[in-house]
Amino acid sequence: MASSLNEDPEGSRITYVKGDLFACPKTDSLAHCISEDCRMGAGIAVLFKKKFGGVQELLNQQKKSGEVAVLKRDGRYIYYLITKKRASHKPTYENLQKSLEAMKSHCLKNGVTDLSMPRIGCGLDRLQWENVSAMIEEVFEATDIKITVYTL
């Protein structure tokens, strides 16, 4: 059962929920970070691969770092933010920013209003959440897209 943590601070577009990301509303699109090689062999990426498959479909999109690959599953979009070249590399804030911009653009073109994600880039990738969350706020500032971040 997901429970809301300290409802979004004044003016924040991010809502924090303690619970299972995959228990989010079925109408929410999902997002997480991967590498260009689409390995998804560790962290939450393993669960995305198991739940949504489509590795070849993602590889066929030939996306590079700073771009976003997309799968459509059950009427919603699953966003794969490409933040690094290989699974063994670490992402840069610059590539994360570019891939967030690419995702925002796809969301706006396709009528996505609700987006759920983990603390992207902050698990195995070691980016700092305070920087990542500020970046998400900035990228999605002028949109009506509601973002929910799930933590365990």
Swiss-Prot record:
Effect of mutating H32A: Abolishes enzyme activity
Which chemical reaction does it catalyze?
Answer: 2''-O-acetyl-ADP-D-ribose + H2O = ADP-D-ribose + acetate + H(+); 5-O-(ADP-D-ribosyl)-L-glutamyl-[protein] + H2O = L-glutamyl-[protein] + ADP-D-ribose + H(+); alpha-NAD(+) + H2O = ADP-D-ribose + nicotinamide + H(+)
Which intervals hold domain Macro? Answer: 2-152
Expression across tissues is: Ubiquitous.
The residues that hold substrate are L21, R119, I120, G121, C122, G123, L124, D125, L152
GO BP terms, alphabetized:
DNA damage response; peptidyl-glutamate ADP-deribosylation; protein de-ADP-ribosylation; purine nucleoside metabolic process
For this protein, the record's Pfam families field holds: Macro
Q: Where is this protein primarily located?
A: nucleus
A single GO molecular-function term is: ADP-ribosylglutamate hydrolase activity
Report the subcellular localization. Answer: Nucleus, Nucleoplasm; Nucleus, Nucleolus; Chromosome
EC code(s) of this entry: 3.5.1.-, 3.2.2.-
Q: How might one describe the regulation of this protein's activity?
A: Subject to competitive inhibition by the product ADP-ribose.
Q: Which domain of life is it from?
A: Eukaryota
GO cellular component annotations of the record: nucleolus; nucleoplasm; site of DNA damage
Q: Cross-referenced PROSITE patterns, in alphabetical order? A: MACRO
Please list the residues that carry the modification N-acetylalanine: A2
The leader peptide range reads none
UniProt-listed PANTHER family: ADP-RIBOSE GLYCOHYDROLASE OARD1, PROTEIN C6ORF130
Q: Which disease is it linked to?
A: Defects in OARD1 are found in patients with severe neurodegeneration. Defects were found in an extended consanguineous family with several affected cases in two generations.
Protein name in UniProt: ADP-ribose glycohydrolase OARD1
Q: Provide the species name.
A: Homo sapiens (Human)
Q: Which gene encodes it?
A: OARD1
